[in-house]
């Protein structure tokens, strides 16, 4: 659903300013919503704020290996480095 072209234009592109950005299903939906979703969202918020304050960015290094499965769209291997800008 997160890559449904009828819901998200350019679904494979990260566009955080989308009007419907919060309509993703990353943490499930309804009674199947992940119990740790709010904690994960808070942790990501703090991480991004701290990286912004320290003027840091994440750089992808090397080849990206994706996990292909019915219920998971993630990464098997994703090498990164942190740098300042």
Spans of features found by a protein language model:
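Divalent-cation-assisted or electrostatically stabilized phosphate/pyrophosphate-binding catalytic cores
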Residues: 26
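C-terminal domain-closing interface element
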Residues: 76-85
